[in-house]
Curated annotation (Swiss-Prot):
UniProt KW Hydrolase keyword: yes
Gene Ontology terms for molecular function: arginine deiminase activity; hydrolase activity, acting on acid anhydrides, in phosphorus-containing anhydrides; hydrolase activity, acting on carbon-nitrogen (but not peptide) bonds
GO-annotated biological processes: arginine deiminase pathway; nitroimidazole catabolic process; response to antibiotic
pH dependence (UniProt free text): Optimum pH is 7.2.
UniProt-listed SUPFAM superfamilies: Pentein
Protein name in the entry: 2-nitroimidazole nitrohydrolase
Enzyme Commission number(s): 3.5.99.9
Provenance organism: Mycobacterium sp. (strain JS330)
Length: 379
């Protein structure tokens, strides 16, 4: 990726010259200049120069920058007036085991622990605050602790179209505004059809995205996301591995299948994935096999109990952050030669998510490609 380290505002107003315009050269014709402008790459010609920096969590390279939200009393979904009106309605949508109310003090300690883990690994941490009593046009915000809804792709932020949670409407817009106002990162696209929750998607190589067809995604929304981020990925190829988990709402306690890709599968190293077998249909498993991926299967009990053993966050190939109480799965990951940094995730799972879900990933370095995976010798 091109590194942009000088914002236009650092130049004196009278210091600009025609040579500062990328497409300009002495003697260029009007037609040649216009055509060159039309053909310029959006990410390297516009988005990154506007931001004055590189950004995007595409791929599985080293993670360098994130954002978190410190929970407040307004972060607790079960304290929402709408939730109290019909807890069974929301519990039916989510389907996860009920572990009781969220302990705010413990939730804040978990957040500090996670931030410390990032900082100890050289990752810059930003903090996102919401207004007092945050609400959208339909009621109080719910689930806005999950800053993955504001995750930044190469090219810019993406506005979600949520599949089934009315309390999330407006969250990705707010986080996109935060990214623009705080980091100068522009929006890339808004999903306007169907359903697409990009923050719960993930990548298993520099040019391989994982999505689902589920309560959170349909084909219309998926097509719109893939069309946008594939054009700004900076890779010659771009693949979308589409899972089809058997689940009506968010989570199926009987099987452990989830509507979100990042609860079902995540990269832990070059060509190594931690997976929930219940979410892998035949086509997905065949594609992974044919492309030389090694599958580390999560412990089925930990997956069904929504301990979120697959919801690890890759810091760099061969190093992940994981939930501390996923003992069996974490050992399997270690046995695969991967370093596991364990942090507490008790309260975030009560809020129906995991460690990876709550992190806005702002920037990753370019990392291993699908060619690297295909060339790996392991079987």
């Amino acid at each position: 990726m091109t590194t942009v380290d000088k914002r236009p505002s650092s130049r004196g107003y009278g210091d600009w010259r025609l040579s500062d315009i990328p497409q300009y050269k002495d003697g260029i014709s009007t037609y040649e200049f216009v055509r060159a402008t039309h053909e310029a790459d959006y990410r390297t010609h516009q988005a990154e120069p506007v931001a004055g920096r590189t950004f995007g969590f595409n791929g599985i390279g080293r993670l360098t920058e994130v954002a978190l939200h410190m929970p407040t009393k307004y972060t607790l979904h079960d304290q929402s007036s709408q939730y109290k009106e019909s807890p069974s309605f929301f519990q039916g949508l989510m389907g996860v085991p009920d572990r009781g109310p969220v302990d705010l003090a413990a939730f804040q300690r978990e957040t500090e622990e996670l931030a410390t883990a990032f900082e100890n690994n050289g990752i810059k941490v930003h903090w996102v605050d919401y207004p007092e009593e945050p609400a959208n046009p339909y009621g109080p915000l719910m689930g806005h602790v999950f800053l993955s809804w504001g995750s930044i792709w190469r090219g810019g932020s993406v506005i979600s179209r949520f599949g089934f949670l009315p309390g999330m409407v407006g969250v990705s817009e707010y986080l996109a505004k935060w990214a623009w106002n705080t980091l100068n990162i522009p929006p890339l696209v808004a999903i306007t059809e169907g359903a697409m929750e990009p923050g719960a998607c993930n990548m298993i190589a520099d040019e391989v995205l994982v999505t689902c067809l589920s309560a959170s995604y349909d084909q219309r929304g998926t097509d719109q996301l893939v069309a946008a981020i594939s054009k700004t990925s900076g890779t010659e190829e771009f693949h979308n591995l589409q899972l089809r988990p058997a689940v009506e709402g968010f989570f199926n306690k009987a099987t452990g299948a989830c509507a979100h890709p990042d609860i079902n599968i995540n990269a832990i190293d070059v060509g190594k994935l931690v997976v929930s077998p219940a979410a892998l249909d035949w086509d997905a498993r065949t594609w992974l096999y044919d492309n030389n991926f090694e599958l580390i299967e999560a412990d089925p009990d930990e997956q069904r109990e929504f301990l979120a053993p697959c919801n690890v966050l890759l810091l760099e190939p061969g190093k992940v952050i994981a939930h501390a109480d996923c003992h069996k799965t974490n050992q399997k990951i270690r046995d695969a030669g991967v370093e596991v940094i364990e942090v507490t995730g008790t309260e975030i799972r009560k809020a129906c998510g995991g460690i990876k879900c709550r992190v806005m990933q702002i920037n990753r370095e370019p990392g291993p490609t699908l060619a690297d995976v295909r060339n790996r010798v392991w079987r």
